[in-house]
């Protein structure tokens, strides 16, 4: 009896952990994707921000308001909007 209760609880914990990982997947970037975004995709293109400043997408981290240059979105670093 105790073993079946333990198995059910363990199954629920694993199910919750998997669903949490799927929800949080957009918040974390794999090391390979991070390196690709910093080096492979960096073409040193300057993009004007709303305030009139200029930035390079690979060198600006997202601020507390998750603001990025125009045409970019926050995903740890400011990255081009795809699609």
Curated annotation (Swiss-Prot):
Reported impact of residue 59 to A: 49-fold decrease of binding affinity to Nav1.4/SCN4A
Entry GO MF terms: potassium channel regulator activity; sodium channel regulator activity; toxin activity
Predominant location category: secreted
Tissue distribution of the protein: Expressed by the venom gland.
UniProt signal peptide: 1-21
Location in the cell: Secreted
Propeptide: 22-53
One Gene Ontology cellular component annotation held by this UniProt entry: extracellular region
UniProtKB keywords: Amidation, Disulfide bond, Ion channel impairing toxin, Knottin, Neurotoxin, Potassium channel impairing toxin, Secreted, Signal, Toxin, Voltage-gated potassium channel impairing toxin, Voltage-gated sodium channel impairing toxin
Disulfide bonds: 55-69, 62-74, 68-78
Effect caused by changing residue 58 to A: 61-fold decrease of binding affinity to Nav1.4/SCN4A
Positions of modified residues (Isoleucine amide): 82
Miscellaneous notes: Negative results: does not inhibit Kv1.2/KCNA2, Kv1.3/KCNA3, and Kv1.4/KCNA4 channels. Shows an extremely weak inhibition on Kv4.1/KCND1.
UniProt family annotation: Belongs to the neurotoxin 30 (phrixotoxin) family.
Role, per record: This gating-modifier toxin shows an important inhibitory activity on sodium channels. It is very active on Nav1.7/SCN9A (IC(50)~0.6 nM), and also shows activity on Nav1.3/SCN3A (IC(50)=292 nM), Nav1.4/SCN4A (IC(50)=2.2-159 nM), and Nav1.5/SCN5A (IC(50)=2.3-2.9 uM). It has also been shown to inhibit tetrodotoxin (TTX)-resistant (IC(50)=27.6 nM) and TTX-sensitive (IC(50)=30.2 nM) sodium channels in rat dorsal root ganglion neurons. Lower inhibitory activity has also been shown on potassium channels: Kv4.2/KCND2 (IC(50)=604.2 nM), Kv4.3/KCND3 (IC(50)=425.1 nM), and Kv2.1/KCNB1 (IC(50)=14.3 uM).
Domain notes from UniProt: The presence of a 'disulfide through disulfide knot' structurally defines this protein as a knottin.
Name assigned to this protein: Beta/kappa-theraphotoxin-Cg2a
Record lineage: Eukaryota, Metazoa, Ecdysozoa, Arthropoda, Chelicerata
């Amino acid at each position: 009896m105790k073993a079946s209760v333990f198995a059910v609880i363990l199954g629920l914990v694993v199910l919750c952990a998997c669903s949490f990982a799927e929800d949080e997947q957009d918040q974390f970037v794999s090391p390979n994707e991070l390196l690709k975004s910093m080096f492979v995709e960096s073409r040193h293109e300057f993009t004007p921000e709303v305030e009139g400043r200029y930035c390079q997408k690979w060198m600006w981290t997202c601020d507390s308001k998750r603001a990025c240059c125009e045409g970019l979105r926050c995903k740890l670093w400011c990255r081009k909007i795809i699609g």
